[in-house]
Amino acid sequence: MAKSSKVSIVGAGGNVGSIVAYSVAMQGLAHEVILVDRDKDRAQGKALDMNQAAAAMRTHSIVRAANDYTDIEGSKVVVITAGFPRKPGMSRDDLLFANADIVSEVVENVVKHAPDSIIIVVTNPLDTMTYVALKKSGFPKNRVIGMAGILDGARMTHFIYEKLGFGAGQIRATVIGGHGDYMVPLPRYSTVAGIPITDLLTPQELQEVVEATKNGGAQIVKLMGTSAYFAPGKATAIMVEAILQDSKKIYPCSTLLEGEYGVHGIPNGVPVTLGANGVEEIIELQLTPREREEFQRSVDSVKELIDVLENQNYFGEK
């Protein structure tokens, strides 16, 4: 266990935040799990429910609802899930200014009360909110990370299984790029028990998997009337686990690129090693010209949103 095994989830009253907290507590990843939410009664109710579940599981995790932001002091990881959810027909981009304000407010309190923490951003539009958290916190880039590719890779893994009908638990899928319409699924870097997926599926089947992956979140919104939460919550908990256990495992995450992949000053999803210091290394994949072009489109889509904020002097810079 990490020396500081305290994790705080801001927006824990929501579905994704609740799943993150529940996963962390049930696995006993942290001794303290702090639920921060504007609806304090809801947070207290969820904390009580989770503590009883932890007792049944006989884990040592203690879940507490925060009275205010002072309760996040000493956190090793702060997860930001707070924000307005997507509704049917709403793009992630529609959420831009509303959620930027929420993330800015949260980050201001993180800087004040947990200045040594690692921030994991889950709020959409993901890559842009990661940039907002970076700018507003002033933290080094390794300590502000966006949750993206683990979720998208999990969706791709599921759709590969649907095509194959075998290999459940043995499929490893790789998705880079922004967490949105311009994500870049990479069949070349996806395998089943070490066998390249390109050897098992036809080009047409692969294209169908790619399209299903890109539309995976929207499909759930259409069916449920709200965003997914089980898979995003679990994907975030996997990141928390890697940081607390200093595992150095490789996961695709949104991180600020400063020359890697030919990109400067824009966060985007790429494979990284996650450990006690957050992002400890960025892994540069050898992309084909077509993959690089798709990745650049993803970067450009994030830059467009960042430019919208900067053109409104959102970060107070001249």
UniProtKB/Swiss-Prot annotation:
Positions bound to NAD(+): G11, A12, G13, G14, N15, V16, G17, D37, N99, V122, T123, N124
Superkingdom of source: Bacteria
GO MF annotations, alphabetized: L-lactate dehydrogenase activity; L-malate dehydrogenase (NAD+) activity
Residues engaged in binding substrate: R86, R92, N124, R155
One Pfam family in the UniProt entry: Ldh_1_N
GO aspect biological process, one term: tricarboxylic acid cycle
Keyword Transport appears in the UniProt entry: no
EC identifiers of the protein: 1.1.1.37
SUPFAM superfamilies in the record: LDH C-terminal domain-like, NAD(P)-binding Rossmann-fold domains
Residues annotated as catalytic: H179 (proton acceptor)
Protein's job: Catalyzes the reversible oxidation of malate to oxaloacetate.
Protein name, as recorded: Malate dehydrogenase
Naturally occurring in which organism (per UniProt): Nitratiruptor sp. (strain SB155-2)
Gene transcribed to yield this protein: mdh
